[in-house]
């Protein structure tokens, strides 16, 4: 008997079981966000339909919130309300992934359900036609929480050759990145690209443009898929905004934003108006832009300082960057570079809408 079990999934052995018929039934994997900003999931059997289930056609389910930090033990049931449905790239058709909101037994949204408030803001300001695009940076770690490919008792060569790198010694775990990309495409996630990042073992994928609340839904589903894919390769995914102290880049969740008026000729006026409003609420935004962001927003490594608000054209050291092309045309979008990689996309997109267009009354 082996002294320790493998950390890898045995995907090859699993294949023959995945090919077995399901006799008119499907597996629905319900996914939710826990108290630590991670994803959890569990499965249930449902009758197969000719067309894909809509969220409102799926049953509300529940889980033990005392085991996820979302409810006390004496009143532990938390309800899962389906909000978005995706094809399952792991089990294949007709199986589905069901992104769900968390609700308390008394009919109120769970305190960690940030989607509910964001959805109200998106609905109230739908006439602005908001588009978002998020750039999710992350770091791949081994089982001992060391970045993949790093020397066990030392450090790799300084940053420089790794960003968008090609070749051994410049990138690691590209197989995870490729598998994740294909899973997102299969599931219908609006993934728009990927690249190796500045620090070795750090990668980025982009999701968007997405309309309104769809942004948070697709980013969270993409995060879930990344964790699931990484299981197959024995890797851990870290969204820590500064996983390695010192002269190494941190990890962010750069947020690109525009409205219909910003995308039209003369839209720079609306972009500048929005930036002024963002400046006035800098501290409020920082409060929901991720844990540990002070270690990343130092004014170095392509970041602005957490203590000040700046903006500029093509300036990656600013809080807000206006792309040079947009500056030249006079319309387009802007990039909020402040959010950390572990921030909740619902909170990011929600507070941007609130700051630019006003809060929603209860």
Swiss-Prot record:
Alphabetized SUPFAM superfamilies for the sequence: Glutamine synthetase, N-terminal domain, Glutamine synthetase/guanido kinase
UniProt-listed Pfam families: Gln-synt_C, Gln-synt_N
InterPro entries registered for this protein in UniProt: Gln_synt_N, Gln_synt_N_sf, Gln_synth/guanido_kin_cat_dom, Gln_synth_cat_dom, Gln_synth_gly_rich_site, Gln_synth_N_conserv_site, Glutamine_Synthetase
Superkingdom field: Eukaryota
Ranges of residues in domain GS catalytic: 114-362
Gene3D superfamilies: Glutamine synthetase, N-terminal domain (3.10.20.70), Glutamine synthetase/guanido kinase, catalytic domain (3.30.590.10)
This protein's record includes keyword ATP-binding: yes
Domain GS beta-grasp: 26-107
Keywords, alphabetical: ATP-binding, Cytoplasm, Ligase, Nucleotide-binding
GO function terms (MF aspect): ATP binding; glutamine synthetase activity
Reactions mediated catalytically: L-glutamate + NH4(+) + ATP = L-glutamine + ADP + phosphate + H(+)
GO BP: glutamine biosynthetic process
Record localization: Cytoplasm
EC number: 6.3.1.2
A cellular-component GO term for this protein: cytoplasm
Keyword Chloroplast: no
Assembly description: Homooctamer.
Protein family per UniProt: Belongs to the glutamine synthetase family.
Protein known as: Glutamine synthetase
Organism of this sequence: Neurospora crassa (strain ATCC 24698 / 74-OR23-1A / CBS 708.71 / DSM 1257 / FGSC 987)
